[in-house]
């Protein structure tokens, strides 16, 4: 018997013991992605605060310096969209989860027929509810310096 066998056996036991936790983490990350996607659709496409509010935690910290903080700030943003950009549409192109963080790469078009913006939104979740938000918005240029596309 090789002297490395006990080490290999121990490593296998440790990995097997960790596996249920990894599966639970993977499920939570998938659930977080689903919650963020539904929240995103409720806010930006449906413009429905009540539908969006069920995805919010006990607090909602907004890190966008141009947006008001908390659920009332979100409610005001949705009212602004309804009034100024009723045809606004946002399409999630990519969605990633890393623990309690979900990142979306989005093509947002406020007015039909325009190029729109490329957006990266980052959400932090606690117990499956959204508690923080960051974003970066980049207009899609008429004449980009390359042909790679933004999505």
Q: What kind of feature is each model-predicted range?
A:
Residues 1-8:
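Bacterial N-terminal signal peptides that target proteins for export
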Residues 9-11, 21:
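Cleavable N-terminal signal peptides
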Residues 12-16:
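Hydrophobic alpha-helical segments of integral membrane proteins
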Residues 19-151:
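C-terminal and inter-domain tail/linker signature
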């Amino acid at each position: 018997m090789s002297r490395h066998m006990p080490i290999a056996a121990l490593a296998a036991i440790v990995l097997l013991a960790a596996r249920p936790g990894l599966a639970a983490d993977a499920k939570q990350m998938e659930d977080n992605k689903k919650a963020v996607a539904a929240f995103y659709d409720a806010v930006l496409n449906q413009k429905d605060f009540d539908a969006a509010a069920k995805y919010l935690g006990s607090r909602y910290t907004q890190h966008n310096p141009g947006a008001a903080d908390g659920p009332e700030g979100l409610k005001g943003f949705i009212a602004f969209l309804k009034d100024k950009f009723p045809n606004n549409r946002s399409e999630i192109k990519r969605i990633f989860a890393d623990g309690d963080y979900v990142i979306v790469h989005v093509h947002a078009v406020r007015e039909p027929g325009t190029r729109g913006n490329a957006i990266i939104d980052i959400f932090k979740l606690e117990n499956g509810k959204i508690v923080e938000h960051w974003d970066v918005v980049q207009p899609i240029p008429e004449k980009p310096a390359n042909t790679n596309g933004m999505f």
